[in-house]
Curated annotation (Swiss-Prot):
Pfam families, sorted: Zein
Domain of life, source organism: Eukaryota
Role of this protein: Zeins are major seed storage proteins.
InterPro entries: Maize_Zein_Storage (IPR052508), Zein (IPR002530)
Naturally occurring in which organism (per UniProt): Zea mays
This protein's UniProt keywords: Repeat, Seed storage protein, Signal, Storage protein
GO terms for MF: nutrient reservoir activity
Signal recorded as keyword: yes
Note: The alpha zeins of 19 kDa and 22 kDa account for 70% of the total zein fraction. They are encoded by a large multigene family.
Protein name: Zein-alpha A20
Annotated family: Belongs to the zein family.
Signal peptide (UniProt feature, chain positions): 1-21
């Protein structure tokens, strides 16, 4: 890159002084300095006077110089704009190399706020693009809390009953499936209502409850299909 910049500067100098071109010996260093335009900085001129200097010195001189973008430069040669853009690119790279370590050190020293900012970044973008959707997301925890609160309010009488009278609460827990069944299927609920006295009787006597569990399929069959239940009784008597 330094060689290209040096070539551009030489072409610029030759194009600016083509009318006053003079042949000089090769060993002389004066032609290069005399061919340079007067508006170039003295630092570049000093670099060009000594051809033994390395291209890295030339690159440093161009990066440190401040070439003004005057109309005269644009009229004489469009190559100066390319030189200026190269200088700006070099400065931007140097600035980036200086700033990036500082940013990394700040991020490592204060990682928690940096991670929090990264987490909140989608929400900030959403609030900018769609404020209504952002507001709904902000209200979402309150909606969930309101739902849980309403459920607690529904269960509050049962909790109070369980604290005051555990026996009555246990009875309500036993009857709760029947209440749900009544809401879903009224015919099945009426069937369960017919069996309710048996449940209450067997709840007081666990041994009888076990017998009921064994006889429950036959009882349900007798309620749904009396003819089939009668046939099962006949078959059972014949077997025994």
């Amino acid at each position: 890159m330094a060689t290209k910049i040096f070539s551009l500067l030489m072409l610029l100098a030759l194009s600016a002084c083509v009318a006053n071109a003079t042949i000089f010996p090769q060993c002389s260093q004066a032609p290069i300095a005399s061919l340079l335009p007067p508006y170039l900085p003295s630092m570049i001129a000093s670099v060009c006077e000594n051809p033994a200097l390395q291209p890295y010195r030339l690159q440093q001189a161009i990066a440190a110089s401040n070439i003004p973008l005057s109309p005269l430069l644009f009229q004489q040669s469009p190559a100066l704009s390319l030189v200026q853009s190269l200088v700006q690119t070099i400065r931007a790279q140097q600035l980036q190399q200086l700033v990036l370590p500082v940013i990394n050190q700040v991020a490592l020293a204060n990682l928690s706020p940096y991670s929090q900012q990264q987490q909140f970044l989608p929400f900030n973008q959403l609030s900018t693009l769609n404020p209504a959707a952002y507001l709904q997301q902000q209200l979402l925890p309150f909606s969930q809390l309101a739902t849980a609160y309403s459920q607690q309010q529904q269960l509050l009488p049962f909790n109070q009953l369980a604290a005051l009278n555990p026996a009555a609460y246990l009875q309500q827990q036993i009857l709760l499936p029947f209440s749900q069944l009544a809401a879903a299927n009224r015919a099945s609920f009426l069937t369960q209502q017919q069996l309710l006295p048996f449940y209450q009787q067997f709840a007081a006597n666990p041994a009888t409850l076990l017998q009921l569990q064994q006889l429950l399929p036959f009882v349900q069959l007798a309620l749904t299909d009396p003819a089939a239940s009668y046939q099962q009784h006949i078959i059972g008597g014949a077997l025994f």
